[in-house]
């Protein structure tokens, strides 16, 4: 792995969430640091599910009712750094203080969330988001997450180079079975349990173009669905403002010098 890729991947973080309120019951997901105190992830990683698998149509509507109940307590959402994370053993480097996501209780076309953290994270990359242009079929992306890749060792960060965007919603792929809403796209290379919320990075620029939402078996190609980040540019702007506010409050309370924030999109 090149030094540039190592730095880029350091910005992909593990997220441990106690969805049932019991700190000993932690669900592992992935996310991306998009400001020193702001993480991008999937909403199903930080909200309690009431259905096992969303059933969606190409308009982004649910065919099996509401998917989510309330949000997890932000203080029970931890962010972990490093290439190998074991949430039952390791200590989080930060906790969430606020969760931002689309309204409603449906994951279809809306499985994205931002976490404002209680402290800035240093020594890792802050990854840019591509908010001004959608992803296109045929593009190459680099999925990164803590599903372990081909070894399927959950908690090990892995990437899949040159994954191809097979389709962009609204569409239904008869070959793979993927049904995509207007804000979703499908890649060919498998994502695994633990990769949820992890980013797909533009192979050329390193910008985040989507986050893992749902998918088929880890061992098969196709039907791996991402939510586009450009479709939620306004939510991203709100999240950056909340992160900046938290930084100012932290500075005022502790009289510390803040880490530089990336420019708001």
Give names to the regions the model predicted:
Residues 7-15, 183-185:
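Short, hydrophobic/aromatic-rich segments at coil-to-beta transitions
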Residues 2-8, 19-23, 28, 55-122, ...:
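Conserved catalytic-core segment of clan PA serine endopeptidases
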Residues 27-29, 89-95, 125, 156-162, ...:
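Short beta-strand segments
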Residues 27-28, 33-47, 53-78, 160-166, ...:
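C-terminal subregion of chymotrypsin/trypsin-like serine protease catalytic domains
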Residues 14, 38-40, 80, 114-116, ...:
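Residues within well-ordered beta-strands of beta-sheet-rich folds
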Residues 85, 108-188, 222-239:
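Chymotrypsin/trypsin-fold serine protease catalytic domain
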Residues 19-20, 44-48, 83-86, 118-122, ...:
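Acidic glycine-/aspartate-rich tracts in secreted/extracellular proteins
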